[in-house]
């Protein structure tokens, strides 16, 4: 496929505000693609070269990209920087530079065969792989060769891609729907395969080649989509939901981790499927010592502890582990422990379809607890009062609460169902719990907030429609440093119109691709005609909103937008709140 064909589709996707139109455009694109290039097309649409856990990064900042454009066009760096400053878009700067190049003889566009998708992808992969002495010059030369062959519109999307600002915001579920339509594959079967092996490029090539999805198996080294939990704040309701019996375990305030062991090699993946092994060399060593298996996939929570007292510390302390050049120091200053709670695979045996109680037994058989690795504390209950006692014990020890699970439940990858239920209480607020919401818009600040965003439009996610519905406008709880950080975090996702996956009655000053997730709390959840979350579910014409919302200070960088609080969770919180508020 010619790269120009892909670019036409990207431009059309970027300009639409309708998700159905987006799906049709992508379906048409996939039908035209050859099997050997469809994986590359998928990666390009997603803004990545490889799946997230492979950690392939281009390592190209705006200045380096502009140097490559300058080399290809003869337009000076100062002129390009002025264009970039004026447009705020490195892609637009590249497009305009190629449209008005001072030395068009440098450009090969129109003088040879058009760029192919595979040529662009393979060149960008070489850019990502360039390392060591002279790597920067190599990256510039490779990119310049692409810009020299590209049309102005092609250059726009190449530039955006290499600096990580493609701005399309196409969700994995949208791509799955388009692949299903393009190749006549059952959508639910494709979703199941994606949950097991969440590499859409590989799956797209698999179906394009006409191979059966049954060949896709759980594989050590490839993270599966994590199973997620609903939430309730009553032990009796939890027991009723779980059929009268529950496995209750401590809910630790840490980082959820999927641990893969294969032939002595340990990999650690985040809930966003990113490889975070580099941050936890001590956990890698501890897993090798504690787990007796050749191959295994386990789940647990990595928790920071006080090196002097051994007491558990808040999740935020783990942020010290994220600075790659300071990990060795952080290991000493911010030690961690791993609390395991599930076993998904062991030596060729897929356990995800086995009941939880069986998986727990197998977990205890393969894990030898040590100072650094333990099995999360758990018990089986059939009495609500006993659950409450266990809950208060957990909270008194610094836990967030409990996670209560059906003993007979299988591991539902990627699902947020009622087989796992969080039992949490926030005693500092009238709201039962905090919520994790996605920033979809912003309002310009005034006074001392001038030049930044003063408030943000937040939304909850609906997995049934793959859309985001607004819940509140929040401006409280942000320090000056927070507002500056939010501005910087959101700039790469700024778009000229409402995103096709966002449903909103409010019109903010700025729209964003749904990407950034933050934690919010408020006084209560109320009915509101201004917001679209659960619109019409409680009362015709009105949705749910958070009254007096406040940012807690916690950036949920560990969560993807699709892992944010769902609309069903919002309505459950609203119902629970009403039950508490109304005397019996």
UniProtKB/Swiss-Prot annotation:
GO terms for molecular function: ATP binding; DNA binding; DNA ligase (ATP) activity; metal ion binding. Keywords: ATP-binding, Cell cycle, Cell division, DNA damage, DNA recombination, DNA repair, DNA replication, Ligase, Magnesium, Metal-binding, Nucleotide-binding. It catalyses: ATP + (deoxyribonucleotide)n-3'-hydroxyl + 5'-phospho-(deoxyribonucleotide)m = (deoxyribonucleotide)n+m + AMP + diphosphate. Disulfide bonds: none annotated. ATP binds at residues 249, 256, 271, 301, 341, 416, 422. The active site is at 251 (n6-amp-lysine intermediate). Its cofactor is Mg(2+). GO terms for biological process: cell division; DNA biosynthetic process; DNA recombination; DNA repair; lagging strand elongation. Its EC number is 6.5.1.1. It holds the Pfam family DNA_ligase_A_N. InterPro entries: ATP-dep_DNA_ligase, DNA_ligae_ATP-dep_bac/arc, DNA_ligase_ATP-dep, DNA_ligase_ATP-dep_C, DNA_ligase_ATP-dep_cent, DNA_ligase_ATP-dep_CS, DNA_ligase_ATP-dep_N, DNA_ligase_N_sf. DNA ligase that seals nicks in double-stranded DNA during DNA replication, DNA recombination and DNA repair. Belongs to the ATP-dependent DNA ligase family. This is DNA ligase. It comes from Pyrobaculum islandicum (strain DSM 4184 / JCM 9189 / GEO3).
